[in-house]
């Protein structure tokens, strides 16, 4: 017989629990650290490698030529950069001019939380119109996490994902008329239930110990988890698992205790590198398959690709991700076509220069966002030994490797337990600002990661030694078309 306690026993009743922000349930510093470490982990992984200029990369020797005026006017990889003179530069919707990212341009100072509410509401309405959203919240007595997600103990991961997605869209939090924002009980509980039941170790603990066993599990803020981690998986066939999502997945899968975050960060680098290698191999093979599909029927191929792209728009950040992937595909395809189709012409490496410019801009954005993350952590998390149990425990363990001072260790645990339950008193406006900054930073880090990964995979596809030059040429042309279709969709 299961020892699982009901949610109601732990004061988590859907019907009776008073609505309040998730921050009042879990310390702000705890939530911040859970998410921030993911971004810092990705930044550390990125910095372990050299930032090579694209000028050093060639696809079997890159030949170049000058673009004709006509080609300049019609080629989006060229016109969407600041290398082209444009009197209406401020009207360029793609915003790749100077150091401004596409995401910043589209938002144009708009509240990112408001933007996400609008996008998720639209996706939910589209799903209802298309008769996709069938999942209903359990209207009976909600006794446990399984009831919250309307599943049972034997439901597979796909059912968990589907129900979590549909129910989260149904209960996505709204901004009130006075511009205040508060996460609702249903949305909170859906996220917490999913973050426990979708990871086997956590699920086993819950099945054996009930909600009590989840008390000290790290739970990422529901809004950040849904928009920044979960929904990116809807585009998995094109972008794989992002580095941020992979880190969070490792962290939750292994049910790492908060006091072990620092050591886990160091240990996870190797796993993240292996995961990234697998991601690139998988995406390279998937891209080959997509480009080779109906190789002799371009019209049928384009219709299938358009249908796939339409499905990709079901993610709240899809506009930004489609632009990142589309621009990269189009640019890499152009680099290859210029080297092979026009090898006898003089060319100044325009597409390579465009890529260099874009990559340098991405690195600048990445550095800026990592610095912003550090600033947030300093503000909301105590990085001093006197109040930080992680640093204190690490120092204690280091100084006492030769002997077991159990009483002292127990006292450290008591201090940690007290700090675990401590809340930082910050205003609702500060809560809102914190969420805004975290969402913006995670979005930008994800986009930098996606572009770098997709570029590597696209190169691999066009350097595939198992096929001949005619296949390479066909793939490059289709890659260019695929990129253009994605860019069109991102602009709708």
From Swiss-Prot:
The entry's keywords: Membrane, Merozoite, Transmembrane, Transmembrane helix
List, for all copies, the residue spans of the domain called J: 144-210
Q: What is its main location?
A: membrane
Membrane topology field: Single-pass membrane protein
Q: Which domain of life is it from?
A: Eukaryota
Does this UniProt record's set of keywords contain tRNA processing? no
- The name this protein carries in UniProt is Uncharacterized J domain-containing protein PF3D7_1401100
Q: Which organism is it from?
A: Plasmodium falciparum (isolate 3D7)
Residue ranges crossing the lipid bilayer per the database entry? 30-46
Q: Name one GO cellular component term.
A: membrane
Where does the record say this protein resides?
Answer: Membrane
User: What biotech uses are recorded?
Assistant: Possible candidate for an effective malaria vaccine as determined by epitope response in sera.
């Amino acid at each position: 017989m299961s020892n699982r306690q009901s949610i109601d026993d732990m004061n988590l009743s859907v019907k009776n629990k008073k609505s309040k922000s998730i921050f009042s349930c879990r310390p702000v510093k705890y939530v911040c650290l859970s998410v921030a470490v993911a971004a810092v982990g990705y930044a550390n992984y990125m910095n372990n490698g050299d930032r090579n200029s694209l000028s050093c990369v060639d696809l079997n020797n890159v030949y170049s030529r000058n673009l004709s005026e006509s080609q300049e006017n019609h080629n989006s990889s060229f016109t969407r950069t600041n290398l082209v003179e444009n009197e209406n530069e401020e009207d360029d919707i793609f915003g790749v001019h100077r150091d401004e990212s596409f995401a910043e341009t589209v938002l144009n100072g708009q509240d990112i939380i408001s933007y996400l509410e609008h996008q998720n509401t639209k996706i939910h309405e589209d799903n209802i119109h298309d008769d996709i959203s069938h999942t209903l919240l359990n209207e009976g007595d909600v006794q446990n996490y399984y009831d919250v997600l309307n599943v049972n103990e034997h439901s597979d991961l796909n059912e968990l994902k589907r129900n979590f997605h549909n129910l989260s869209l149904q209960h996505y939090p709204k901004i009130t008329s006075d511009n205040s924002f508060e996460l609702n009980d249903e949305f909170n509980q859906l996220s917490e239930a999913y973050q426990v039941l979708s990871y086997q170790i956590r699920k086993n603990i819950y099945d054996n110990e009930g909600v009590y066993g989840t008390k000290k599990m790290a739970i990422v803020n529901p809004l950040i988890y849904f928009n920044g981690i979960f929904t990116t998986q809807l585009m998995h066939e094109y972008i794989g698992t992002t580095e941020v999502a992979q880190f969070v997945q490792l962290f939750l899968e292994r049910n790492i205790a908060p006091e072990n975050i620092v050591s886990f960060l160091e240990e996870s680098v190797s796993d993240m590198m292996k995961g990234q290698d697998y991601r690139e191999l998988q995406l390279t093979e998937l891209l080959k398959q997509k480009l080779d599909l109906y190789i002799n029927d371009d019209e049928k191929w384009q219709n299938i690709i358009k249908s796939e792209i339409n499905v990709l728009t079901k993610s709240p950040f899809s506009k930004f991700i489609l632009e990142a992937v589309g621009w990269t595909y189009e640019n890499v395809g152009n680099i290859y076509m210029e080297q092979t189709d026009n090898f006898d012409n003089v060319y100044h490496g325009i597409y390579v220069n465009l890529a260099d410019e874009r990559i340098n801009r991405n690195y600048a954005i990445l550095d800026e966002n990592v610095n912003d993350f550090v600033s947030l952590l300093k503000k909301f998390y105590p990085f001093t030994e006197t109040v930080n149990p992680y640093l204190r425990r690490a120092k204690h363990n280091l100084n006492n490797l030769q002997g077991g001072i159990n009483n002292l260790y127990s006292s450290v645990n008591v201090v940690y337990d007290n700090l675990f339950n401590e809340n930082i008193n910050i205003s609702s406006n500060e809560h809102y600002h914190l969420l805004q900054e975290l969402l913006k930073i995670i979005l930008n880090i994800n986009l930098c990661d996606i572009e770098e990964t997709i570029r590597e995979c696209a190169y691999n596809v066009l350097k595939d030694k198992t096929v001949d030059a005619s296949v390479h040429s066909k793939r490059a042309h289709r890659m260019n078309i695929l990129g253009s279709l994605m860019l069109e969709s991102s602009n709708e």
